[in-house]
Amino acid sequence: MTQFASPVLHSLLDTDAYKLHMQQAVFHHYYDVQVAAEFRCRGDDLLGIYADAIREQVDAMQHLRLQEDEFQWLSGLPFFKPDYLNWLREFRYNPAQVCVTNDNGKLNIRLTGSWREVIMWEVPLLAVISELVHHYRSPNAGVDQALDALESKLVDFTALTANLDMSRFHLMDFGTRRRFSREVQQAIVKRLQQESWFVGTSNYDLARRLALTPMGTQAHEWFQAHQQINPDLATSQRAALAAWLNEYPDQLGIALTDCITMDAFLRDFGIEFASRYQGLRHDSGDPVAWGEKAIAHYEKLGIDPLTKTLVFSDNLDLPKAVELYRHFASRVQLSFGIGTRLTCDIPQVKPLNIVIKLVECNGKPVAKLSDSPGKTICHDKAFVRALRKAFDLPQVRKAS
């Protein structure tokens, strides 16, 4: 296999916003915490043949650095603090933290090191893998095909929403990690900028260059790490929620609900958290059932759901977003994050179902259970059982 001609990544900011948001919180509160994360391909793709090309791109990432114009732009955002930005200015990717191997056709990747550094690898590394694989598998596809597919979807979307009040419909690009390519994501986002309901992107590089609002708060790893940082497993989710508010008391207040399951989350999400957080994000399980639970929870606490926002981001496309909008629009504020179905939706191209997830914190196991059994990730079945017991969940799902 010929090697990729040039580095896939051109900017340290070519990542999801929540990575920097979490990194700042880790920098301030958990500077010395050590973690391990691992790559998973949820599909049947044998990606091991790309290991050498991926390794080459990993090595090239050490040359990325925060540029002066990027530093100044980040400095103008209200939630970044000078000490963190000055540290980020000196940050460099360390390829020694990444082990990439071809295991009989299966791609294995393991990341180890300080959390404040390892946290940066996930999104750009997944984007690199996705772009490399599509480069070799679909050499004749690209921006033109992606834009043609998008235009067709927008025609259908216009027809689908012709009789709807769309003034409260808000769509975000969440497509960095599984994009067809950097160029395709940029072209898609630039086209969507023409639509009144498009409100921003999770990609900090695109947000800066296209004058868009960067979108994102925290990911599963924030909650997972607290399973070992916090001395009591049963209160670890509450500790994660409290630590986030300590770092961001009045901003970035959308909480992810499915690290343990929605039911376990709501038991921890009492009146103080529910009042202070601006809303919740759905990332697994039945979205309608989840939304109904969220609204009922707010109402039970005496909080008007119309003062809160529900963000839907699990395997969405435009028709699914419209369906959810029809169901919930009169009862709660809504935002929709669409990823793969925007940035890798090209005829004859099969998107990759790939993730990188935390598996250890300070040498001990962590787990993501979620509201979709297939998304459970943990090596240690005994720890999964302990986690389920701590959060009063039935012992039914197996770790994978």
UniProtKB/Swiss-Prot annotation:
UniProt modification remark: Transiently phosphorylated on a His residue during the reaction cycle. Phosphorylation strongly increases the affinity for substrates and increases the rate of nicotinate D-ribonucleotide production. Dephosphorylation regenerates the low-affinity form of the enzyme, leading to product release.
What does it do?
A: Catalyzes the synthesis of beta-nicotinate D-ribonucleotide from nicotinate and 5-phospho-D-ribose 1-phosphate at the expense of ATP.
* Catalytic EC class: ligase
**Keywords, A to Z?**
Ligase, Phosphoprotein, Pyridine nucleotide biosynthesis
Q: What is the protein name given in its UniProt record?
A: Nicotinate phosphoribosyltransferase
Sequence positions bearing Phosphohistidine: H220
The family database entries (SUPFAM superfamilies) matched by this protein are listed as: Nicotinate/Quinolinate PRTase C-terminal domain-like (SSF51690), Nicotinate/Quinolinate PRTase N-terminal domain-like (SSF54675)
Q: What PANTHER family does the record tag this protein with? A: NICOTINATE PHOSPHORIBOSYLTRANSFERASE
Gene Ontology cellular component annotations, sorted alphabetically:
cytosol
Family membership: Belongs to the NAPRTase family.
EC annotation?
6.3.4.21
Q: Which domain of life is it from?
A: Bacteria
Keyword Ligase assigned to the entry: answer is yes
Q: Which Pfam families match?
A: NAPRTase, NAPRTase_N
Please give the catalytic activity noted in the UniProt record: nicotinate + 5-phospho-alpha-D-ribose 1-diphosphate + ATP + H2O = nicotinate beta-D-ribonucleotide + ADP + phosphate + diphosphate
Q: Which GO terms describe its biological process?
A: NAD biosynthetic process via the salvage pathway
Q: What pathway, per the record?
A: Cofactor biosynthesis; NAD(+) biosynthesis; nicotinate D-ribonucleotide from nicotinate: step 1/1
Q: Which GO terms describe its molecular function?
A: nicotinate phosphoribosyltransferase activity
Primary gene name: pncB
